[in-house]
Amino acid sequence: MQTITLQDTLPCVFSAEPPLRSEVWLQPGLDLKQGVFYLVSAESGAGKSSLCAYICGYRRDYKGSILFDGRDINSLTVKDWCRIRREEIAYLPQDLALFPELSAADNVFLKNRLTHYKSKEEIARLFDTLGLKDKWDSPVSKLSVGQQQRVAIIRLLCQACQFYLMDEPVSHLDEENNRIVAELVQEEAKKQGAAIISTSVGNPLLLDYTHTLKL
């Protein structure tokens, strides 16, 4: 996938009072290109999580169209979506979608067993780099939110993709951990030629973005 296009897209809930200055909603043809780094800056309630859910096909309560390389995503089959989510879009939701009863490592390996993208040694190095070496066997329910966020970042990096889509990926991280995460994601994105689309309401992932879009 090379391009995600939003055409006059708007959450249905905003239909009565559409935003006047959004650089995303109601744009006649907003192209998000592979290999480009985008920050989607938003206020709370502006629809950033909705945007991510729309792009990933988890919600359809919007007007307008979303296209993948010119194809309307509403025409995609379940099989298409399984392939896209496994090979083309790596998604980190704001709620992290971790399994609290499983260990940090098991949460990561659930993904990696589907993608076979990283070795156990590579995953162990990511745990070490992100200060989670001693949390390998810890149930996610026993971790702080910031630690859970780092586990979810490691899981995100366990697949090939053309687009990294991240909803407030560092909202509970300090600046040092933010920079470490940014370096890891940027390195992986450049290796794959992937785009980064990251949302924020005030604590953005510390990247050198190509474009900042106000939601």
Residue ranges and their predicted role:
Residues 164-168:
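Catalytic Walker B motif of ABC-type/P-loop ATPase nucleotide-binding domains
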Residues 120-135:
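Conserved ABC ATPase "signature" region
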Residues 56:
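Helix-to-loop junction immediately C-terminal to a conserved catalytic motif
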Residues 139-147:
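Conserved ABC ATPase signature
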Residues 73-90:
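ABC ATPase NBD coupling module
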Residues 64-73:
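Conserved ABC transporter NBD signature motif
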Residues 95, 101-114:
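Q-loop/switch helix immediately C-terminal to the Walker
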